[in-house]
């Protein structure tokens, strides 16, 4: 049976920034969905402006993994929807948060912390080191992945200690690395 994934995106940049719209004509959620579908996953998308933000009870009940992309509209997410997602995660649904979703209501509720971290945007190189090479999520990856130009997210990242640390990252501009992929007992991998 295929993994059932729902990709959620606030879908704000695509509506307000022509450059983003050109890169992601189907939205960031559409680009992510396409990649996951190419890997044999059953994928649907949901966005902030849909009723219930596209995360109805039926959608959540038929989701094994929820991918959450957020950046600037965290406070627009309904507390009712956050509570539904929270309960589904506690019941076993996986959650993967991307980009600035570390400040999303759902991630902060799950972590029980501020989820604050250091950040800068100077277009520097990042190297993501695999620190748990036997973990299934890094199957087929060498010692590291290198991104030639990215934003820096750095420690201290105010989250609880993870059950498993799979990647740490290093940035060309200095500053401490950040724990990139953290897996807690209720997160999917």
Label every PLM stretch briefly:
Residues 2-15:
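Short beta-strand segments enriched in small/hydrophobic residues
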Residues 8, 46-49, 167-170:
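Conserved beta-strand termini and adjacent loop/short-helix elements that scaffold enzyme active sites
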Residues 9, 70, 118:
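Residues that line or immediately flank small-molecule/substrate-binding pockets and catalytic motifs
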Residues 13-17, 175-176:
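Short, solvent-exposed loop/turn elements at domain surfaces
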Residues 17-20, 108-110, 179:
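Short aromatic-enriched loop/helix-cap "lid" or pocket-rim segments at secondary-structure transitions
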Residues 21, 25-104:
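Helical hinge/lid and interdomain linker segments adjacent to catalytic or ligand-binding clefts
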Residues 73-143:
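A glycine-rich, often tryptophan-bearing local segment used as a flexible ligand/cofactor-contacting loop or short
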Residues 120-189:
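Catalytic beta-strand/loop cores that center a nucleophilic Ser/Cys/Thr
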């Amino acid at each position: 049976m295929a993994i059932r994934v729902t990709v959620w995106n606030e879908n704000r940049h695509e509506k307000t920034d022509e450059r983003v719209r050109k890169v992601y004509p189907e939205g960031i959620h559409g680009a992510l969905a396409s990649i996951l579908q190419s890997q044999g996953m059953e994928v649907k998308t949901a966005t902030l402006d849909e009723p219930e933000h596209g995360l109805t009870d039926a959608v959540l009940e038929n989701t094994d993994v929820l991918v959450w992309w957020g950046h600037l509209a965290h406070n627009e997410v309904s507390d009712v929807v956050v509570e539904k997602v929270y309960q589904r995660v506690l019941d076993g649904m996986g959650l993967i948060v991307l980009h600035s979703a570390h400040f999303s209501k759902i991630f902060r509720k799950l972590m029980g912390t501020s989820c604050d971290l250091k950040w800068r945007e100077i277009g520097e190189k990042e190297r993501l080191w695999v620190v748990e090479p036997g973990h299934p999520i890094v199957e087929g990856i060498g010692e590291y992945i290198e991104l030639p130009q990215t934003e820096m997210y750095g420690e201290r990242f105010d989250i609880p200690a993870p059950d498993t640390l799979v990647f740490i990252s290093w940035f060309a501009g200095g500053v401490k690395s950040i724990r990139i992929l953290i897996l807690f007992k209720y997160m999917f991998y």
